[in-house]
């Protein structure tokens, strides 16, 4: 009985290989990256950073494009390789995909969070910040700003918070 089952199993393997078709042809995938001696670490005080954007009346955000005051924040990196670094923020995009959406749709409505570079220009999600040079000790501080931005008129009050993730680009 075992020989019969084994023979049937082998027969199935050989017969199915004759019918295998590759309808897509060959697909090439190019993978690339860098291997570095060491990478930056985030200063322990900045690992779970909270940026308090403050309390604002809805009258501050009456029309689409209205913003609140800029709130400065920084990320301190240590142990970086020589050269320069840039930061790239990611997160859930708002209807304006350059802005960070709030965490919960039940929160404040028609408002998003805008990130800005140290020169106060907008830093869109997924876009690298300007580079900053690493000092001789392997440290660098990158300065940013954040603010609320109305996506449309009729902002409704509520909690307005979001999470952003950052990646370090080495140059």
UniProtKB/Swiss-Prot annotation:
Which Gene Ontology BP terms does the record give? cell adhesion; cell adhesion involved in single-species biofilm formation
Q: What does this protein do?
A: Part of the sfmACDHF fimbrial operon. Could contribute to adhesion to various surfaces in specific environmental niches. Increases adhesion to eukaryotic T24 bladder epithelial cells in the absence of fim genes.
Q: Which family does the UniProt entry place this protein in? A: Belongs to the fimbrial protein family.
The UniProt entry lists the main location of this chain as other
Localization: Fimbrium
Q: Extra notes?
A: The operon is cryptic under classical laboratory conditions, but is functional when constitutively expressed.
**Keyword Secreted among record annotations:** no
Q: What induces it?
A: Expression is negatively regulated by H-NS and subjected to cAMP receptor protein (CRP)-mediated catabolite repression.
**Encoding gene (name):** sfmF
In Swiss-Prot or TrEMBL terms, this protein is called Uncharacterized fimbrial-like protein SfmF
Q: Which SUPFAM superfamilies match?
A: Bacterial adhesins
GO-annotated cellular components: pilus
- Keyword terms: Disulfide bond, Fimbrium, Signal
Q: What is the lineage of its organism?
A: Bacteria, Pseudomonadati, Pseudomonadota, Gammaproteobacteria, Enterobacterales
Origin: domain of life: Bacteria
Which region is the signal sequence?
A: 1-20
């Amino acid at each position: 009985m075992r020989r019969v089952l084994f023979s049937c199993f082998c027969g199935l393997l050989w017969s199915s290989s004759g019918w295998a078709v590759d309808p897509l042809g060959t697909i090439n995938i190019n993978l690339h990256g860098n291997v570095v001696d060491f990478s930056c670490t985030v200063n322990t005080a900045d690992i779970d950073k909270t940026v308090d954007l403050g309390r604002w009346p809805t009258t501050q955000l009456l029309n689409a494009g209205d913003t609140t005051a800029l709130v400065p924040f920084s990320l301190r990196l240590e142990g970086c390789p020589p050269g320069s670094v840039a930061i790239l923020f990611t997160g859930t995009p708002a209807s304006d995909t350059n802005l960070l959406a709030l965490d919960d749709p039940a929160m404040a409505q028609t408002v998003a969070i805008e990130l800005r570079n140290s020169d106060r220009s907008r830093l869109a999600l997924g876009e690298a910040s300007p580079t900053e040079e690493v000092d001789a000790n392997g440290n660098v501080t990158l300065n940013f700003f954040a603010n609320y931005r109305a996506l449309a008129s009729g902002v409704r009050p509520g909690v307005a918070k979001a999470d952003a993730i950052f990646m370090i680009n080495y140059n």
